[in-house]
């Protein structure tokens, strides 16, 4: 089909969802630029709305990372992995404060996340050494377990409910202070931020500190959704 159409390649959809037809997608020779603000205009509420792009009909695709809850982006060199990772990062930075979302960025290539060095959303400086990456992921596992224990103690199921109750308790404290009364006991403390862990080129980490990294990523992928910790991972090789 690609030969007959003189196209660089085609994609087959068999069937097109909701129909009994087979779809053939042929790339347009004249590419249309997709701008991040245009895609984000379709985003709903929430600090973890991330821009994916546009579909073949030009409709914006935006997803909530809190519901996904983790992302694995794979592809060859030049396929657009880094563009998508940076789009996701910028989607969050444009809509969330450091009190709402914090990042841990792992960059074995040392150049991909260099522009983000020093931003207030970072928990730690951009991690470039494999051993440091292993330690950062181990810390994330410990933080996940600490949060889950705290949720259990407070009788909540996830970070959304915890933060709602924490804000309500803060409002009650402020109202009591204005009335000159002693504030009620607040078992929740401050609202806690989401944590987004972004790893560029996972294969490099797996070759150097595979066992430690694999254990931490597995634990986070299995249990961290309720704790508000999410993974965005890019790799060339599985």
Feature locations, PLM:
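Cytosolic ligand/metal-binding cores
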Residues: 1
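Conserved lysine of the Walker
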Residues: 81
């Amino acid at each position: 089909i690609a030969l007959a159409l003189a196209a660089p390649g085609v994609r087959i959809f068999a069937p097109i969802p909701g129909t009994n037809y087979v779809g053939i997608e042929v790339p347009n020779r004249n590419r249309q630029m997709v701008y991040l603000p245009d895609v984000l205009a379709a985003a709903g509420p929430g600090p973890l709305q991330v821009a994916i792009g546009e579909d073949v009909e030009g409709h914006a695709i935006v997803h909530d990372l809190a519901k996904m809850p983790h992302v694995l982006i794979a592809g060859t060199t030049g396929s657009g992995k880094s563009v998508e990772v940076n789009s996701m990062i910028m989607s969050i930075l444009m809509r969330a404060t450091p009190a709402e979302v914090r990042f841990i960025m792992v960059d074995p290539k040392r150049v991909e996340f260099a522009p983000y060095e020093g931003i207030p959303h970072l928990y730690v400086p951009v991690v470039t050494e494999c051993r440091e990456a292993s330690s950062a992921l181990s810390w994330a596992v410990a933080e996940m377990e600490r949060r889950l224990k705290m949720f259990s103690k407070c009788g909540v199921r996830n970070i959304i409910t915890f933060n709602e109750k924490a804000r309500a308790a803060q409002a009650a404290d402020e109202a009591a202070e204005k009335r000159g009364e002693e504030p009620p006991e607040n078992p929740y403390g401050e609202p806690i931020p989401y944590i987004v862990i972004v790893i560029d080129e996972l294969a490099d980490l797996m070759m150097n500190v595979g066992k430690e990294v694999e254990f931490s990523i597995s634990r986070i992928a299995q249990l961290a959704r309720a704790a508000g910790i999410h993974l965005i991972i890019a790799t060339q090789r599985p």
